[in-house]
Swiss-Prot record:
Subcellular location(s) per record: Nucleus
A Gene Ontology molecular function term of the record: ATP-dependent protein folding chaperone
Primary gene name: HSP70
Classification of source organism: Eukaryota, Fungi, Fungi incertae sedis, Microsporidia, Unikaryonidae
Annotated source species: Encephalitozoon cuniculi (strain GB-M1) (Microsporidian parasite)
NCBIfam families assigned: PRK00290.1
Protein name: Mitochondrial-type heat shock protein 70
Length: 592
């Protein structure tokens, strides 16, 4: 669908739906009650989630992905795997060792990215991708876009969800709703198919895995349970293929490529190609000329991989999805035989091996009716339509993916909200002091399933002051957990004896401060202004060149000084943009 057709169409919703993916991202909008995928400026329906930063130039998408080999340290990919995470997380520490670009620990312990000495948060990198999607939508709709629904993996914790909202804000978007990716896919599938009964959404994307079990009935999409792994996806398979090729080359040639950044980048590019080809073919070949030099001269890499070999490489990754599926079924109180439909989401689900495993888990053939790369964005757009009141009789009831609670004496985790509790929710429990005459307490909030807080995710703390000095166990401290429809939490506390409003100091454990977000918003706006100037300059040069190629009889009507000045523009000489835009406009009027 061409963007050139956009002005003639009536679009019912100005809330765009965005799937901010690890590997690719996608944007959709509602037209006449149905979602429409918006192509980017390059005519692509999905945009690679890759950002290349060279000095002040920020390039996003395919053009950025093409720079990975030439500028590996300046080109950021799969930043979604780092968003809202700590640098010291074992998974993060292991993952960043294989990245060609630099990462670092921010002052609050979050993982950040460093390019040419400048520091960027993963949310800021995500914002660059969102800005491109926003621009694509504005070009398509022919009007500014300010509001969006953005999807996140169902198993994202509070920090990751908040960081995703920050990314939207930095990009100039009001994120009116954050919804889970599997729920969005189910919405896209269910509304289109008028599905009823229990649905499983198996979402294996570039960086994360989610499984959600939903009950769909008369437009109500009720998530019964969700499970997953926020560090499992196509990136891991690509890395396993790279290891396989590097080891194979070492055995054949006696040369170890594991520390050769350029070679690894080229092999990874080949791994991505093989992964796609083996989804439709039985064999694929990786051919990389001049992979390295040796004493005997340049070496070339050539290795054919069969689908059987590839599936053996993928086995341990794909099998890691089985246990979460079984846990989700158990949490939902269902057997696999109770599932009526299985929806596949994410590029990895194109693999025949993945589809076989899914069939073994649920005992039925998974549906291939929806595009696994576009379903999530379409579902987000549909949710935007619901919020706008353009789509009726639809209700989403999602759940909290992980338990929430506080730390008790001895580091014990006390659950207040159990996982798979329907959101939004509000729940209060009463606690007390652990010492005599204690006048203040630190209420530390955690998210997870382990019995000790040290094994769970620390979200932050509330300092409750002015508690009456009483014997331990006497004060009644009411701790209330609330969730909004985005799955983002708020925790409050008060002393029930005095019933006086308490001053709460919430100290976040991670994420961007308000000042950091404001600075990034300003930086994003500055870069958008620079991009706009570059676009206008390029358009001026093209338009001037086209005008100067008009027939001499037409050019005679244009003042000579206009033609001379436009000629200098085409030659690349310096010029004042606004002034020359006016000259071009005057020149065109002279011809009419």
């Amino acid at each position: 669908m061409s963007n050139a057709d956009a002005p003639s169409r009536k679009f019912s919703s100005s809330i765009i739906g965005i799937d901010l993916g690890t590997t690719n991202s996608c944007v959709s909008v509602i037209k006449d009650g149905k979602p429409v995928i918006i192509e980017n400026q390059e005519g692509e329906r999905t945009t690679p989630s890759v950002v290349s930063i060279l000095k002040d130039e920020v390039v996003v998408g395919t053009q950025a992905r093409n720079r990975i080999l030439m500028h590996p340290r300046n080109t950021i990919f799969a930043s979604k795997r780092l968003i809202g995470r700590k640098f010291g997380d074992p998974e993060v520490e292991k993952y960043v060792k294989g990245l060609p670009f630099d990462t670092m620990s921010h002052c609050n312990g979050d993982v950040w990215i460093r390019v040419d000495g400048k520091k960027y948060s993963p949310a800021q990198i995500g914002a660059f991708v969102l800005s491109k999607l926003k621009s694509s939508a504005e070009a398509f709709l022919s009007h500014p876009v300010a509001r969006s629904v953005i999807t996140v993996p169902a198993y994202f914790n509070d920090s990751q969800r908040q960081a995703t909202k920050d990314a939207g804000r930095i990009a100039g978007l009001d994120v009116v709703r954050v919804i889970n990716e599997p729920t969005a896919a189910a919405l896209a599938y269910g509304l289109d198919k008028s599905a009823r009964g229990n649905i499983a959404v198996y979402d294996l994307g570039g960086g994360t895995f989610d499984i959600s079990i939903l009950e769909v009935e008369d437009g109500v999409f009720h998530v019964k349970a969700t499970n997953g792994d926020t560090f499992l996806g196509g990136e891991d398979l690509d890395n396993e293929v790279v290891k396989f090729i590097v080891e194979d080359f070492k055995q054949k040639e006696g040369i170890d490529l594991s520390n050769d950044v350029d070679a690894l980048g080229r092999i990874k590019e080949g791994a991505e190609k093989i992964k796609k080809e083996l989804s439709v073919s039985c064999t694929s070949k990786m051919e990389i000329p001049y992979i390295c030099n040796s004493q005997g001269g340049p070496k070339h890499l050539c290795r054919e991989i069969t689908r059987s070999e590839f599936e053996q490489i993928a086995k341990k990754i794909v099998e890691r999805t089985i246990a979460p599926c079984k846990r989700a079924l158990a949490d939902a109180g269902l057997d696999s035989s109770d599932i009526k439909h299985v929806i596949l989401v994410g590029g990895m689900t194109r693999m025949p091996y993945v589809r076989r495993v899914v069939k073994e888990i649920f005992g039925i053939e998974p549906s291939t009716d929806i595009n696994p790369d576009e379903a999530v964005a379409n579902g987000a757009a549909l949710q935007g339509g619901v919020l706008m009141g353009e789509i009726d009789d639809v209700l989403l009831l999602d759940v909290a993916p992980l338990s929430l609670g506080i730390e008790l004496l001895g580091g014990v985790f006390s659950r207040v909200i159990r996982r798979n509790t329907t959101i939004p929710f509000k729940e209060t429990q009463v606690f007390s002091t652990s010492e005599d005459n204690q006048t203040e307490v630190d209420i530390k909030v955690y998210q997870g399933e382990r019995s000790m807080v040290a094994d769970n995710k620390y979200l932050g703390q509330i300092k409750l002051k002015s508690i009456p000095p009483l014997p331990r166990g006497v004060p009644r401290i009411e701790v209330t957990f609330e969730s909004d429809a985005n799955g983002i939490y708020r925790v409050t506390a008060q002393d029930s004896i005095t019933k006086e409003p308490q001053s709460l100091e919430i100290i976040p454990s991670s994420g961007l401060t308000e000042a950091e977000v404001e600075r990034m918003v300003e930086e994003s706006e500055r870069l958008r202004h620079l991009d706009e100037m570059k676009r206008r300059k390029a358009e001026l040069i093209v338009s001037s060149s086209e005008l100067l190629r008009r027939p001499p009889t037409e050019l005679e009507r244009i003042p000579k000084n206009y033609l001379d000045r436009l000629g200098k523009v085409v030659k690349g000489e310096d010029f004042d943009l606004k002034e020359m835009e006016e000259v071009l406009l005057s020149a065109k009027k002279s011809m009419s």
